[in-house]
Amino acid sequence: MVTIKDVARISGYSPSTVSRVINHSGYVSIKTNKKIKQVMKQLDYVPNAIAQDLSKGKTHKIGVVLPHLRHSYFSQMLLGIMDAALQTEYSVTLLPSEYDSNLEMHYLEQLKRKEYDGLIFTSRGISLSQLTQYTKYGPIVCCENPGNKHLTAAFSDRKAAYIQAFTWLKDHSIAKIVFLFSRPATVSMTTQLTLDWFAQVYGHFPANKHIITNVTTPQDGYRAAQTIAMKDNTVQYFFTNGDDIAAAVRQYYVDQHLPVPGLIGQNGQVASVTLNIPTINHHYAQIGRQAFKLVVSPELKNQKIKIKADFVLNNQLFKNL
C-alpha cells in the first residue's frame, strides 16, 4: 500500500510538503505542487480520508440519532434533514438507537472523539442534562423543546393546535376519546403534555383504559382498535399519533362491519386528505431542515426554533401548496 512517505521519497520532497499539497494548506510553489501530483498519479496514491479529516479538524459528517423509522415522525424529520444536507458538503450518518441509553451515550462519545462534526437527536432515551454535558465537544441539536436547558433545538410548537383540537371535540360534545401514543407519559414528554392539554380543556384526564401506548405503526393501530372494540362500543373518537394509524383504526371497524368512530390523526399525511380525517400537521420535514441548519452553524448555538403546528379540518391540508 502506497503511503505519503513513498510519495515524499520518490518526489524528493519532505512528507510535510506532500501533506500541504494533499490538504491544500500552506504555501507550496507551482513547480513543487505539479511534481508531487505527478508522483501521486504515477503511484496511484489515494490520500487517507480519515487522516485528512484529522488534519482539518472536520469530518463533514453529521450523525442523526433515530430510535427507529417505523413512525412518520421520524421519516418526515429525516426527509427534511436529507433535503438540507444535499445543499451542503456534509454527509449524514444514521445512528439507530431504539431509545437504548447505552447506544445514545456511545454516539455522544463518538462526538467527543470527533468522529462527527455534530449530532441531531430526533428523540432520546437519555436525559436532556446528559445531552447538555456533551455540547462542549461539538454541536448537538434536539428536536423537542429543551425548556431552560442550554441546548440548541428545532421543534414543533404544538400547544395551540392541541388546545384547538380538544376544544373542537368538546364543542361537538365528544366525551369518550381513546388516545394512541408511541410511549407512555412516564418517559415521553409529548405524551404527558398531550394529556395535560386535554385536562386543561376538559377539566380531567382521560380514563386509563382509554390510553394505549406502544403504537407506532398502522398494524399497531389496527390491533389497538380491536382491543377497544372488544371492550367498549361507546367510544366516540380516537385521537391517534399518525394519520396512517388513524386510517388503520378505521379499517378495523370497516372490516368488522362496525360503526366507525370519529378520528383525529397527526403529521399531515396523505391519509388525512383521502379519508377526510382532521389532522395536526407538525411540519416535521421543516423541523428537520432547521435542525440540520443549526447543527452545521456553531454560531447559532443554544438557539431554539419553534415551528407552529396546525390543527387542520375539512381536507385543507394541501390548500396552500
Which residues does each PLM region occupy?
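Hinge/beta->alpha junction and helix N-cap segments in small-molecule ligand-binding domains
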Residues: 67-75, 95-102, 154-164, 180-226, ...
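Flexible loop/hinge segments that line or gate small-molecule binding clefts
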Residues: 122-161, 244, 267-278
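Short beta-strand segments enriched in small/hydrophobic residues
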Residues: 17-20, 54-70, 176-185
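Flexible loop/turn connectors
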Residues: 232-237, 241-321
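N-terminal helix-turn-helix/winged-helix DNA-binding helices
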Residues: 2, 41-79, 88, 110-113
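Short, well-structured alpha-helical segments in soluble
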Residues: 102-115, 220-234
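N-terminal helix-turn-helix DNA-binding module of bacterial transcription factors
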Residues: 1-60
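Central regulatory/effector-binding core of bacterial HTH transcription factors
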Residues: 86-128
